[in-house]
Amino acid sequence: MDLVTKLPQNIWKTFTLFINMANYLKRLISPWSKSMTAGESLYSSQNSSSPEVIEDIGKAVTEGNLQKVIGIVKDEIQSKSRYRVKIAVTGDSGNGMSSFINALRFIGHEEEDSAPTGVVRTTKKPACYSSDSHFPYVELWDLPGLGATAQSVESYLEEMQISTFDLIIIVASEQFSSNHVKLAITMQRMRKRFYVVWTKLDRDLSTSTFPEPQLLQSIQRNIRENLQQAQVRDPPLFLISCFSPSFHDFPELRNTLQKDIFSIRYRDPLEIISQVCDKCISNKAFSLKEDQMLMKDLEAAVSSEDDTANLERGLQTYQKLFGVDDGSLQQVARSTGRLEMGSRALQFQDLIKMDRRLELMMCFAVNKFLRLLESSWWYGLWNVVTRYFRHQRHKLVIEIVAENTKTSLRKALKDSVLPPEIH
């Protein structure tokens, strides 16, 4: 302690500044590694990959073999092309669910394969319909309506096995009842995709004294206010007439449905896989930061090269370990046939510019001070300080490379794996 107190005043101030800077950077680095999950709001889905496929993907990511990852995922996503998407149509009895299914399929109620319709309750048990010409590999399930019995919404949904469906369409007409609100609350809690469809708009227009725009606005406002009061986020809302399947919101409904079917079949499974990849990359980054042998090998080179060269060599090492070096990226680009994806690894000069923390840690003043501490007069006393600071820089580079790997892999998977979306 006597030695420290006898330090020249300007050196002591520099040392104090250095310690404060180290503590500040440590606070900055720590929360950065706690990345936000990309799919926190992902819808629940029955269309998931097998544990064996997930294990193979995770192993390839850990090995840094992104080309192998893309190959496995591509085969997996292609196998989803014939996944049968299950859509449930539900609501209060008498809301016109069966008529809606017929209109969605562009068939009349008099046709042989149509869902039975009528004034009295016609659907007493779940019935499955399809429309291969408009919605291939999609099951449209006409569920018995709520409200005919004293059955609670919870027991009704359990009986209908609602958790097995990929998308739920809540049909309403005349009034948006408490049952509709309860259905919406439950769908949100279960993280299910769902729509609200207001049918029989033709009847509303024929009996209302309000102009059409005002009536439509009033219906929409009433539904949204009821949902907001129940703290339900705004779902897609469509106002339609089953007798006019080409007018009002019906075309928009079909377009939205086609896109969501595509998402259920392809995008949702890919997002789940991407989250697995992200987690494996994060785990690998954590292991590398704790790898003492790797740090010692890199540290051994400090005496023969300056800090910048040492950190640049570290960047190249980490990129090879994660599979995002120039050679690996070029292989990925060639194998996917998408050279425009980019086959250039992150460069050191770009690395410094893209992260303010690393730029601060590599500034002239810090490097000069580290060199001062390495002199023969200081080495024995302050070696632990310089080693700690260098380790923090390497750990930060590992985190940056890991995040860059996540971004690059997600883009490569999206560009090379997803089939063209139906518009």
Curated annotation (Swiss-Prot):
Instruction: Give the GO terms filed under biological process for this record.
Output: autophagy; CD8-positive, alpha-beta T cell differentiation; cellular response to interferon-beta; cellular response to type II interferon; cytolysis in another organism; defense response to protozoan; innate immune response; negative regulation of PERK-mediated unfolded protein response
Q: What happens when the gene is disrupted?
A: Mice do not show obvious abnormalities, but are more susceptible to infection by Toxoplasma gondii. In contrast, normal clearance of Listeria monocytogenes and cytomegalovirus infections is observed. Macrophages from knockout mice show impaired envelopment of parasites in autophagosome-like vacuoles. Mice lacking both Irgm1 and Igtp/Irgm3 display resistance to Mycobacterium tuberculosis infection compared to Irgm1 mice that are highly susceptible to infection.
Q: Where in the cell is it found?
A: Endoplasmic reticulum; Cytoplasmic vesicle membrane; Lipid droplet
Write out the catalysed reaction: GTP + H2O = GDP + phosphate + H(+)
Query: GO CC terms on record?
Result: cytoplasmic vesicle membrane; cytosol; endoplasmic reticulum; lipid droplet
Q: Where is the IRG-type G domain?
A: 83-260
CDD domains, per the entry: p47_IIGP_like (cd04104)
Q: Can the keyword Nucleus be found in this entry's annotation?
A: no
Which Pfam families does the record associate with it?
A: IIGP
Summarize where GTP binds, as residue positions: 92-99, 117-121, 200-202
Q: Which SUPFAM superfamilies match?
A: P-loop containing nucleoside triphosphate hydrolases (SSF52540)
Question: What is the predominant subcellular site recorded for this chain?
Answer: endoplasmic reticulum
Q: What does this protein do?
A: Immunity-related GTPase that plays important roles in host resistance to acute infection by protozoan, such as Toxoplasma gondii and Leishmania major. Acts as a dynamin-like protein that binds to intracellular membranes and promotes remodeling and trafficking of those membranes. Acts predominantly to restrict acute protozoan infection: expression is required in both hematopoietic and non-hematopoietic cellular compartments and is dependent on Stat1. Only plays a partial role in the control of latent Toxoplasma infection.
Name it: Immunity-related GTPase family M protein 3
Q: Which organism is it from?
A: Mus musculus
